Amino acid sequence: MIDLHTHTNGSDGEKTPEELIDLAISKKITALAITDHDTVDSIEKAVKYAKSKDILLIPGIEVEAQIKKGQMHILGLFVDYKNKELRKKLKYIKKARDSRNLKFIEEFNKLGFNITLDELKEVSEGKIIGKPHFAKIFLRKKYIKEKDEIFQNYFEKTPFKEIPKTIYGPEEVIKTLKEANAIVILAHPQSLKLENEELKEKIKELKKYGLDGLECYHSKQTKKQMEDFKNIAQEYGLIITKGSDYHGPNTKPGIELGTGKKNNIVLEESEEKDMVNKLLEISKNRYV
């Protein structure tokens, strides 16, 4: 079994890199990509820890690209996490994210809540602050009963949804990841909120920038979406990947490492091996 889209507490996941790797091994996962949001700070620790383990650890990252409709997240697999230009861009993204978080705090406090930056830093343990950290505070203060309430009632509505986090468009994100030798994958394509024909046009555009693949198996996809995305990937000569988008049982309840939601991303062993072999072949050629 494999999982090519996961998060640690380096961003908004719950487990340390070591804990995530141990969990993967306990589930007989043979290839694991760590793809934290907008940061590669956990990768070095993960790579060192995995060296003595029976698992292929794939250095990765997930970066959001600025678009007008929906959300576009782009994965970089086998990324050179020491690349100077990548790290420079990630610093700019962190500043934009910090600015967004301050605006979130301001808007929440206007509504009568009491949220501080110090609280966010505490629950994030000094790592990248994301929306799940706001949810933790809201749960702690009993402003909400379930984590999803903060997304449904606030983050997905005005003015919160209009507050931008990212500063780079798809072309710049893909270019930066390619320069860091990453294999570039469009994560959970359903987040773009496009019909199949519109999605095809968008993929044609992204392919011109250097897109390598499509995440065709994701925990939040229906069977039909998986089939549609797989067909689109094959039509445009893109590699196919699978990822649970695992964060942990409290952050994303019901999503399991390697198997997704109710085993919805469990595939034949041969198909998963083929995915990894293709990634290894591309990665080998890029680093030669």
Give the positions of each predicted feature.
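Conserved, well-ordered active-site substructure
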Residues: 253-267
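Extended substrate/RNA-proximal surfaces in nucleic-acid metabolism proteins
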Residues: 51-204, 263-288
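An N-terminally biased module of ancient metal coordination in phosphate/nucleic-acid-related enzymes
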Residues: 1-70, 154-157, 168, 172-251
